[in-house]
């Protein structure tokens, strides 16, 4: 994983059922259930770094995303584990997708997920062209329930996630990374 050079709050994620870092995947999805009851949204913090290829201008890429679901004291006291119990290849080359499972563009009836992806690519390409430090795209997939999906530009091919769990199994924080599998 490339170490983030800065973090920024990028907004909120609508919580429902499970949260996944593998949005837009038709198979091989991992999800995090057991979320705190009560909050319907969680703040999302993304760790960015500058990435440069050759003589091209540097662009902001994401290597880590954190969703704190409780106060810091509860998160510090929790046990952390590998929430996915292994790795999976990314569903989308060049992007990581964070969403509540029912708000994944592929799972919302009547949505054109490919049109959503084209819009995401347009937004992120525009941000690259502007040298935007906090470059990501949010797509509202279910306006009636406020459901959304957050798309992050990544260079790495793999995705993984970690959970901070209380003794009763309640998830109080999620952390997600993008990385390259060492061969």
Name each region found by the language model.
Residues 1-183:
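Intrinsically disordered, low-complexity acidic regions enriched in Pro/Ser/Thr
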């Amino acid at each position: 994983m490339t170490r983030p050079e800065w973090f920024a709050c990028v907004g909120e994620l609508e919580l429902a059922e499970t949260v996944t870092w593998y949005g837009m995947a038709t198979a091989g999805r991992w999800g995090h259930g057991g979320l705190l009851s009560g909050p319907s949204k969680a703040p999302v913090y993304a760790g960015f770094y500058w990435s440069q290829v050759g003589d091209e201008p540097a662009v902001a890429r994401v290597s880590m995303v954190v969703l704190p679901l409780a106060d810091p004291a509860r998160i510090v006291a929790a046990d952390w584990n590998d929430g996915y119990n292994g790795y999976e290849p990314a569903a989308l080359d060049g992007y990581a997708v964070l969403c509540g499972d029912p708000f994944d563009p592929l799972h919302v009836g009547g949505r054109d997920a490919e049109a959503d992806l084209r819009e995401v690519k347009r937004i992120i390409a525009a941000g690259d062209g502007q040298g935007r430090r906090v470059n990501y795209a949010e797509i509202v997939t279910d306006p009636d329930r406020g459901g959304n999906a957050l798309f992050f530009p990544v260079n790495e091919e793999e995705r993984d996630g970690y959970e901070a769990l209380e003794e009763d199994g309640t998830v109080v924080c999620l952390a997600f990374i993008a990385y390259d599998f060492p061969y």
